[in-house]
Amino acid sequence: MSASTTATLRHDWTLAEVRALFVQPFNDLLFQAQTLHRAHFDANRVQVSTLLSIKTGACPEDCKYCPQSGHYNTGLEKEKLLEVQKVLEEAARAKSIGSTRFCMGAAWKHPSAKDMPYVLEMVKGVKAMGLETCMTLGRLDQEQTEALATAGLDYYNHNLDTSPEFYGSIITTRTYGERLQTLAYVRDAGMKICSGGILGMGESLDDRAGLLIQLANLPEHPESVPINMLVKVAGTPLENAEDVDPFDFIRMLAVARILMPQSHVRLSAGREAMNEQMQALAFFAGANSIFYGDKLLTTANPQADKDMLLFSRLGIKPEAGEGHADEVHQAAIEQALVEQQSSAMFYDAASA
């Protein structure tokens, strides 16, 4: 194994170094990323999560990409916090189809005191099923963070979204510093961090590099790094944003893998718009986590049967979690193959 694959994790990346990674020949970049990936992970295993929106719409934040913002008319109806029992039913369903982590998202600036007891019950209930737990609830204070940790929350998601320099062009209702403070509270409470960003909002190459530098130069790398491709929603200020070049998106995944070689890099929002070939390249570039199921908060996500068939064709299996994930995964593949016999369920990659 070369020195480059065994080096100590770095937290001092510079813009010049990261820019140089982005602009090198595509095949060289992917080779470097795949080499590092294999040094730290089983290259044919992907972590599988399911995401549930536990409170949808009317968020007071003004994130220009988000259909849940109350500042924009996107046709999304406001919903109350889901009942704990409903959340637990969805978690059980997620486990039955092979997910090992259950993520719960609420459209809040920050959780209120009246909602916290219900949120904590959700964490305890999902944890009792043998699933890893993750939540994204907005900004947290120290007391809330410690309460979530005590309840057994494994991961807290709080994305940085983009570089500090470009951030003010996308969001004005929450500062970059507040996001970093929440991440610090999460780390101090002993939970794992899930934090990443979005491509396709009009950011520059240096902004993409800057986002990854912020994440990689944290005192500890996030355990999970979701890389999202903008899902353009009518009514949001970014509904007419330019499409992200597929190769540029793959480059982002590869550079994330190189900077944070021991983190799970998640192929997150926007996967519905990716054909099978692009997803396969994403896995080769070092992506080793996906959201699995029908919806990603409020936007479409590739159907579970399509995911299982693609995994089968690529020789990929989900990372083992509690509950015999391999057996569940194999059963899902067999069921998907049966359903594929119906033309209505057949997935034609050429037209995707």
UniProtKB/Swiss-Prot annotation:
SMART domains the record matches: BATS, Elp3
Residues where [2Fe-2S] cluster binds: C103, C134, C194, R266
Domain of life: Bacteria
InterPro entries per UniProt: Aldolase_TIM, BATS_dom, Biotin_synth/BioAB, Biotin_synthase, Elp3/MiaA/NifB-like_rSAM, rSAM
Cofactor(s), names only, from the UniProt record: [4Fe-4S] cluster; [2Fe-2S] cluster
A single GO molecular function term of this UniProt record: iron ion binding
Catalytic activity entry: (4R,5S)-dethiobiotin + (sulfur carrier)-SH + 2 reduced [2Fe-2S]-[ferredoxin] + 2 S-adenosyl-L-methionine = (sulfur carrier)-H + biotin + 2 5'-deoxyadenosine + 2 L-methionine + 2 oxidized [2Fe-2S]-[ferredoxin]
Cofactor binding note: Binds 1 [4Fe-4S] cluster. The cluster is coordinated with 3 cysteines and an exchangeable S-adenosyl-L-methionine.
EC number from the UniProt entry: 2.8.1.6
Metabolic or biological pathway, per its Swiss-Prot or TrEMBL entry: Cofactor biosynthesis; biotin biosynthesis; biotin from 7,8-diaminononanoate: step 2/2
Binding site for [4Fe-4S] cluster: C59, C63, C66
Domain Radical SAM core: 44-262
Pfam families according to UniProt: BATS, Radical_SAM
SUPFAM superfamilies for this protein: Radical SAM enzymes
Keywords attached to this entry: 2Fe-2S, 4Fe-4S, Biotin biosynthesis, Iron, Iron-sulfur, Metal-binding, S-adenosyl-L-methionine, Transferase
Principal EC category: transferase
One GO term (biological process): biotin biosynthetic process
Function statement: Catalyzes the conversion of dethiobiotin (DTB) to biotin by the insertion of a sulfur atom into dethiobiotin via a radical-based mechanism.
Subunit structure: Homodimer.
Family (UniProt): Belongs to the radical SAM superfamily. Biotin synthase family.
Protein name: Biotin synthase
Annotated source species: Pseudomonas syringae pv. tomato (strain ATCC BAA-871 / DC3000)
Organismal lineage: Bacteria, Pseudomonadati, Pseudomonadota, Gammaproteobacteria, Pseudomonadales
Primary gene name: bioB
